Amino acid sequence: MNKDEELLIEAIENDDLKEVQKLLQEGVDPNILDEDDKPCILSAIRNKNLDIVSVLLENGANPNAVDADGEPIISAAIRTKRLDIINILLENRADPNLQPPRKNTILLKAIQSNNLDIVNAFLNKGANLNALDISGYPIFLKAIKSENLEIINALLEKGANPNLVDKDGSPLLFTAINTKNLDIIDALIKMGANVEAKNKDGNTVLNVLLERRGNVNIISLLIENSQDKEKIFNLKNNNGETFLHLAAQQGNSKIFDKYLDYYPTVNITDKAGYTPLYWSKLLGHTEISNKLIERAEELKETVYTKVTRTKFFENLPSIPKIAVSYNSKVRGETSEATRNKLKYQYCNVEDIDYRKIVPESANAEKKINEEIVNEAKRKAKEFLADKDALVIPGNNSSVDPKIAEHFGGQVNLEKNKFDFARSLAEMAMLEVAIEKGMPIMGICGGHQIINAYLKGKIDEVSKHKHDSIIIEPDSELASIIKRNSPTKDILNQEFWGMHNDKVQEIGGKNRLIDNKDLLKVTATNEHREIEATESQFGAPIRTFQFHPEMSKTTYSNAEIIRDKKIFASFVQSAETFMNKKSLGADIKFKVPVKKSFTEMVLNRKEQQNNQRGI
């Protein structure tokens, strides 16, 4: 930098217009950089000196120059909120769509200034209304979040697309309802926003509003602007639930008063076969239950719930049979709660008394060998022959160390109460169920049995009660919770739990397909102890240390529904198994090889050894 260039920079910094003009007339470059590699015009913009900015531009200063960080100089003008400087830059061909690498568009910066005049200055020069920010989201979405109605209207009037979808698959109308601002929602609808559009979970904005107990005025606005009201009421989310189902779950009597008459039937069902009356009765919304019954009388139809097992359900196709391990002499609280949760589902619950699987002599002597195990497996195969899923619920006993050791597991417990028959019978059932490709669920003790059978490790823990569970984001469990708990942080949930033992190391590590262990951890507690696992291939295996079958009295509607949906999702897996089995199709689900599980593992290991030259 020569002396004259230093003088020009100094004159600009000191707001000395005459000196700036003199030096420019002498031929000093108006695009020189200061010692920080910033264009000299940037100092004039920051000083809000319109005259010096104008002189520099007249003498060839670059209106699209950027500083050392790649930030356009017009960004500084936006920060000063000097409309006159912004206009002079735009008039001198500053690019209204300038977006340097890894930077946001200039229009987004204008929107974030919250100044309508500045936004209009860029719009009048052809700024791209539907551009994306550096994260891939529409800049119009940021305008909606700002809740500046004047700016939103200006963008819409210039042609911003009210039906843009963000990279998460949600139309902008979903962002608008989050603001709870009726005027913004109305503005989008008036400019053509589709009130019937769905997000990636299959929910319309009406569904989402109901799940969040949304503002009735906003809901009414959306409905009144629907082209086909009957159609929008009968749209279903991915769980098969309609607007009426969600209203019944939320207990929103105002919605029922206003819109129930739009439904030609009150017996519309979701994927699990539930009607709105099922949910209103289950959750204690008596007023809504009465409204549904009154509406059914007006329609001269009988209103049904799945709980009552009426002829309405008897006429539906065959339903899956779910085997539940139990002891007919000792029915524990958690075991009964599991059976009751399943009975609310679209399935038949069939008890299997595990004591009938183990030979009496073996149980009396607490003796185990291959002959006894094979006899238990033969009995288990008989009991599970026509079943479509297996559930091993919680109980008051621990996994027997001798049984676990025989199957390759490890149990480090000393003074616990062991149940030899239960441990052997349930591991025999597990072997049969896994070979058949049958869906499996284990709760509390069942969680430990499954992991011990799959060569996991069980340890003792001081009597532990917990509520807070951390869910792994890439798990099926997270997916289920996400669909049904939109108002909560899905990765932090409250569940009831009480146990003396824990899974120290998960099982399934010796069973590999495509280099994946059979099981993965899907939830932990605040002590980082394993709270849930699920299978990564083959038929679904889901285990829970906590108790989704036990609802606390403090649970919200959303938490009650969440627990029901965990069971509903499992029953849907059983239904898939039932259909594949009845069609003679491969029942290994994700594993397209019609071989036993053991054969598949051995084949995989043989392939790996061949590749290594062993």
Curated annotation (Swiss-Prot):
It comes from the Bacteria. ANK repeats lie at residues 3-32, 36-65, 69-98, 102-131, 135-164, 168-197, 201-231, 239-268, 272-301. Signal peptide: none annotated. GO terms for molecular function: hydrolase activity. Residues 348-580 form the Glutamine amidotransferase type-1 domain. This is Putative ankyrin repeat protein RBE_0997. PROSITE patterns: ANK_REP_REGION, ANK_REPEAT, GATASE_TYPE_1, GLYCOSYL_HYDROL_F1_1. Pfam families: Ank (PF00023), Ank_2 (PF12796), Peptidase_C26 (PF07722). The active site is at 444 (nucleophile), 547, 549. Keywords: ANK repeat, Glutamine amidotransferase, Repeat. Disulfide bonds: none annotated. SUPFAM superfamilies: Ankyrin repeat (SSF48403), Class I glutamine amidotransferase-like (SSF52317).
